[in-house]
């Protein structure tokens, strides 16, 4: 299902270390390299940055212009800004990318085709916001039940069923990204979003498995 597709976990700068420590002759940032099957024309990456390019389920004209310019400027690989896999209503910024439904695949395919036409690769960054929300919604999911800053309420400690649901949301989002033609996905596991909350003992007080 995910053959010839790269899945990368954003926790530390492991990917950048990987492509800068090859065996053999010393390389520089302008040299070509490979990441598994993926050919990189140099070691310049555009990191994941929110760019407000998505409105009402569509990529804006300014968004297409931005990615067109980025991919023309000799960047070998572009990471999108964070793209929500589910619970979109918990994002304060309503203009974040969404991949929680199949209906968004055609729009992203247009973006991918544009970037590929200009000779660059593109990865989609996937995220679940977890407790890092400012929105007053009924349920805010987290690894443990903790006070939510500025919301005067507690997060909901996720059940095993909740965990399996969101695991599946990530898997389905990655599959949609692949169908849209992305070269891979970056799983956001930093900056106090859901996955990093599970990795952090300050936010994960669970005693189960």
Q: Residue spans of the language-model regions?
A:
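N-terminal capping/small domains of soluble enzymes
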Residues: 21-127, 155, 166, 174
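Feature marks short, surface-exposed loop/turn motifs that line or immediately flank catalytic pockets
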Residues: 52-53, 84-86, 130-132, 191-193, ...
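Glycine-rich tight-turn/loop motif centered on a GG-T
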Residues: 90-106, 135-165, 195-209
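Cleavable N-terminal signal peptides of Sec/SRP-targeted secreted and luminal proteins
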Residues: 4-18
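Non-globular sequence segments
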Residues: 113-116, 121, 127-182
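Short beta-strand segments at enzyme active-site cores
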Residues: 78-82, 122-126, 180-194
């Amino acid at each position: 299902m995910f053959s010839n597709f790269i899945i990368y976990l954003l926790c530390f700068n492991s990917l950048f270390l990987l492509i800068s420590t090859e065996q053999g002759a010393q390389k520089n940032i302008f040299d070509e390299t490979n990441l598994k099957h993926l050919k990189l024309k140099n070691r310049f990456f555009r990191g994941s940055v929110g760019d407000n390019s998505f409105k009402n389920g569509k990529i804006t004209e300014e968004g297409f212009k931005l990615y067109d310019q980025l991919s023309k400027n000799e960047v070998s690989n572009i990471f999108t800004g964070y793209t929500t896999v589910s619970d979109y209503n918990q994002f304060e910024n309503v203009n974040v990318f969404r991949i929680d439904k199949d209906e968004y695949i055609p729009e992203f395919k247009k973006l991918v085709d544009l970037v590929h036409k200009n000779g660059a690769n593109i990865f989609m960054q996937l995220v679940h916001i977890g407790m890092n929300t400012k929105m007053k919604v009924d349920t805010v999911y987290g690894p443990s039940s903790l006070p939510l800053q500025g919301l005067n309420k507690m997060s909901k400690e996720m059940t095993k069923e909740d965990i399996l649901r969101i695991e599946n949301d990530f898997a389905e989002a990655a599959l949609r990204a692949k169908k849209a033609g992305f070269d891979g996905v970056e799983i956001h596991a930093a900056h106090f979003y859901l996955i990093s909350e599970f990795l952090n003992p300050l936010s994960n007080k669970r005693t189960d498995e």
